[in-house]
């Protein structure tokens, strides 16, 4: 009798724990962040293709798309373009691009985007005309409010000297931010020295003209927009019940996937303190952006890793990054077929690499684990909605 009673208690405890786990997973807020990096967007494009493929297998649904699983998708520069590709609706109100169409997009359009050189020493390297043309063709007249999930795309206004963040949740208070997606994508990609800044105008809530003079989102958020994406999610938590679980920065209730476009330590090997002590403004200008982006990206990852670890939720955060790019793969604008093939291979090889020195789990294994959580969470929410 005592044995039977103990067995029943054990069963109740297991069921209670399982129920609690499911409830916790159902409450999770999911965030995807994609770095900037020009043609190096092929690397996260490869990762996204793998992840979406896993979700399709797990849910036995060839039409499953990343926007179905993430509450917030944020990106900067080329990451902003990827964000738009996987969240902008087509005529069937589904993402106009599947993840397996991202890498082919770079191969088809990259050589044209990064080939229209102005030839001006004192002007931008590329005129941006083809980039705008293809963005208008792909994104049409779609505006922010039509995105299939919350987005967070950054840019910087050089007239007001302030960052501009395009999100759906800001539109009620700032309807002027409901810009066309092609204007936003060009703006977030308009890296100084590479493309001309972008001007466009919308209307305020009073119908007044509102002007934007924008450049690359990396100026506002550096190349890694993970903190921005998390901030958008936590801000929505104050108003949207679906995000309520992460109020008060409860990162235990957040799944964050951050995708990098690769970095390198090559410049560290070629410059010394003795050498750079003789440098002037021009020499520093050639490398300071690369150094700043690498350092800022590292600090963003360091902060997020620390926060999630302190909350014993380190498995809720995954940063996918290649830290050993070499040669032409370090360049954001080398759209030669040979280099793009190398970048695609970098993405494929990255899947087989360990997450870190302390974590032997490969990125492929970690992404499969993330995919399982995303799939289970979606099913739990769908079941709840059906009652």
UniProtKB/Swiss-Prot annotation:
A GO term, aspect molecular function: phospholipase activity
Signal peptide region: 1-23
SUPFAM superfamilies on file: FabD/lysophospholipase-like
Domain PNPLA as annotated: residue spans: 32-230
Assigned GO CC terms: vacuole
Gene3D superfamilies, alphabetized: Cytosolic phospholipase A2 catalytic domain
Compartmental location: Vacuole
Coiled-coil boundaries: 361-385
InterPro entries linked: Acyl_Trfase/lysoPLipase, PNPLA_dom
UniProt keyword annotations, A-Z: Coiled coil, Glycoprotein, Hydrolase, Lipid degradation, Lipid metabolism, Plant defense, Signal, Storage protein, Vacuole
Residues with glycosylation annotation: 115
EC number(s) on file: 3.1.1.-
Chain span(s) of sequence motif GXGXXG: 36-41
Motif (DGA/G): 216-218
Lineage: superkingdom: Eukaryota
Motif, GXSXG: chain positions: 75-79
Organs and tissues of expression: Tuber and stolon.
Membership in a protein family: Belongs to the patatin family.
Comment block on domains: The nitrogen atoms of the two glycine residues in the GGXR motif define the oxyanion hole, and stabilize the oxyanion that forms during the nucleophilic attack by the catalytic serine during substrate cleavage.
Function recorded in the entry: Probable lipolytic acyl hydrolase (LAH), an activity which is thought to be involved in the response of tubers to pathogens.
Other comment: Patatin have a dual role as a somatic storage protein and as an enzyme involved in host resistance.
Name the record gives this protein: Patatin group A-3
Organism (species): Solanum tuberosum
Lineage: Eukaryota, Viridiplantae, Streptophyta, Embryophyta, Tracheophyta
């Amino acid at each position: 009798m005592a044995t039977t009673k103990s067995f029943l208690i054990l069963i109740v405890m297991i069921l209670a724990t399982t129920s609690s786990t499911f409830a916790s997973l159902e409450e999770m807020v999911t965030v995807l962040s994609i770095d900037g990096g020009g043609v190096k967007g092929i690397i996260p494009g490869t990762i996204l293709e793998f992840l979406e493929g896993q979700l399709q297998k797990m849910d036995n649904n060839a039409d499953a798309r990343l926007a179905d699983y993430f509450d917030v998708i944020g990106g900067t520069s080329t990451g902003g373009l990827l964000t738009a590709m996987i969240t902008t609706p087509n005529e069937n109100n589904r993402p106009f691009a599947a993840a397996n169409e991202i890498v082919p997009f770079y191969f088809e359009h990259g050589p044209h985007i990064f080939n229209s050189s102005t030839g001006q020493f004192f002007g931008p390297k590329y005129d941006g005309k083809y980039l705008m043309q293809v963005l208008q063709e792909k994104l049409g007249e779609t505006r922010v409010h039509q995105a299939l999930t919350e987005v967070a795309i950054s840019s910087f206004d050089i007239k007001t000297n302030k960052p501009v963040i395009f999100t759906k949740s800001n539109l009620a208070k700032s309807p002027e931010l409901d810009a066309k997606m092609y204007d936003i994508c060009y703006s977030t990609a308009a890296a100084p020295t590479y493309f001309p800044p972008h001007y466009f105008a919308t209307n305020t809530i009073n119908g007044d003209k509102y002007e934007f003079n924008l450049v690359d989102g990396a100026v506002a958020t550096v190349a890694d927009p993970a903190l921005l994406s998390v901030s958008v999610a936590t801000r929505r938590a104050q108003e949207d019940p679906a995000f309520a679980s992460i109020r008060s920065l409860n990162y235990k209730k957040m799944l964050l996937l951050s995708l990098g476009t690769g970095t390198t330590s090559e410049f560290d090997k070629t410059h010394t303190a003795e050498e750079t002590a003789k440098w002037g403004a021009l020499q520093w200008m050639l490398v300071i952006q690369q150094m700043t982006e690498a350092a800022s990206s590292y600090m963003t990852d360091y902060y997020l890793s620390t926060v999630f670890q302190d909350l014993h939720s380190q498995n809720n955060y995954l940063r996918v990054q290649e830290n050993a790019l070499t040669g032409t793969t370090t360049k954001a604008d080398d759209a030669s077929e040979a280099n793009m093939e190398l970048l695609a291979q970098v993405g494929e090889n990255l899947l087989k690499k360990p997450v870190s020195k302390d974590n032997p789990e490969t990125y492929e294994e970690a992404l499969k684990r993330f995919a399982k959580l995303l799939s289970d969470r979606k099913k739990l929410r769908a079941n709840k909605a059906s009652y």
